[in-house]
Amino acid sequence: MAFAPKVIVVPIDLSEHSRKALASAADLGVCFHSRLVVLTVIEDRFPYPDLFSFDHPTEDFYKVMRERAHEELKKLIEHLPHIKAQADLYITRGRPAEKIVEVAAKEKADLIVMGTHGTSGLSHALLGSVCDKVIRQAPCPVLVVRHSAHE
């Protein structure tokens, strides 16, 4: 039996690494006529709370973050017109690894395609651990896309 993913989950944090993963997932989606679930997770906790002027983000803060994420995802999809009709945008809040695995299970994903690093300054330590957790807990295969040969 050949591997032909019908549902591909693509976690996006708007970093160059995740944009590269989206482009790769889009190409796979075209080849296999897959539906893409483009997912952004808004963290509900901050790794460095001392950098913020508030202890706990408000619902208004999350609303603004959600709206911005939605606009950015729409722009990304518009730059990949061959997948526009086959992509569902999914924005959720929580811990990234947990939410990626949860959405993959809920959507009955056949594949998760994600980048190697994220937007954090400690990209390898933080998203590397997200990627590692997803690989260990995912209900389906995970394809990790490197940004360049210089990583």
Listing of model-derived features with the role each one plays in the protein:
Residues 39, 88-92, 143:
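General small-molecule cofactor/ligand-binding pocket signal
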Residues 41-71, 151:
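Acidic, proline/glycine-rich short linear motifs
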Residues 68, 91-95, 117:
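Short beta->alpha linker loops
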Residues 102-151:
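Gly/Ser-rich helix-loop-strand patches that form or flank binding pockets
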Residues 18, 22, 62-70, 127:
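Amphipathic, non-transmembrane alpha-helical scaffold segments
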Residues 2-55:
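Small/aliphatic-rich secondary-structure junction motif
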Residues 1-3, 17, 31, 77-112, ...:
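Structural beta-alpha unit
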